[in-house]
Amino acid sequence: MGRFVVWPCELDSRLSRKYGRIIPKNLAIEKPSLDEIIEVAETLNLKIVEVDREKLNPRLSGIDEELRTYGRIIIESPYGKVKTLRLIAQKIREFRRRR
């Protein structure tokens, strides 16, 4: 199992890759919240090691306040980081459609 940090900005469609988005823009989500990511991680049976709501990704320090997303989650996953982020993004889209 791999352990890695998931920042909301890695899933945010409003940001460029320069500011930390990892997954492709067509799979990314607008304004992903930390709570959504936690809910989806639990649904996917990923082990959440730590949640820190005050942290800011260092790449976002020079960007407008409205684009900043605070928080990070440390997750253990049997998949790689990119595959896990894609699964999380896909599930968040499904959850948002239901609401």
Curated annotation (Swiss-Prot):
Q: Does the keyword Ribonucleoprotein apply?
A: yes
List the Pfam families. SRP19
Tell me the domain of life.
Answer: Archaea
Supply the InterPro entries for this chain. Answer: Signal_recog_particle_SRP19, SRP19-like_sf, SRP19_arc-type
Q: Which GO terms describe its cellular component?
A: signal recognition particle
Q: Which GO terms describe its biological process?
A: SRP-dependent cotranslational protein targeting to membrane
Q: Cite the entry's keywords alphabetically.
A: Cytoplasm, Ribonucleoprotein, RNA-binding, Signal recognition particle
UniProt subcellular location: Cytoplasm
A Gene Ontology molecular function term of the record: 7S RNA binding
User: Which NCBIfam families is this protein grouped with?
Assistant: PRK03745.1
Q: How does it assemble?
A: Part of the signal recognition particle protein translocation system, which is composed of SRP and FtsY. Archaeal SRP consists of a 7S RNA molecule of 300 nucleotides and two protein subunits: SRP54 and SRP19.
Could you say which protein family the record assigns here?
Answer: Belongs to the SRP19 family.
- What is the annotated role of this protein in its UniProt record? Involved in targeting and insertion of nascent membrane proteins into the cytoplasmic membrane. Binds directly to 7S RNA and mediates binding of the 54 kDa subunit of the SRP.
Q: What protein is this chain from?
A: Signal recognition particle 19 kDa protein
Organism, as annotated: Pyrococcus horikoshii (strain ATCC 700860 / DSM 12428 / JCM 9974 / NBRC 100139 / OT-3)
Gene it is expressed from: srp19
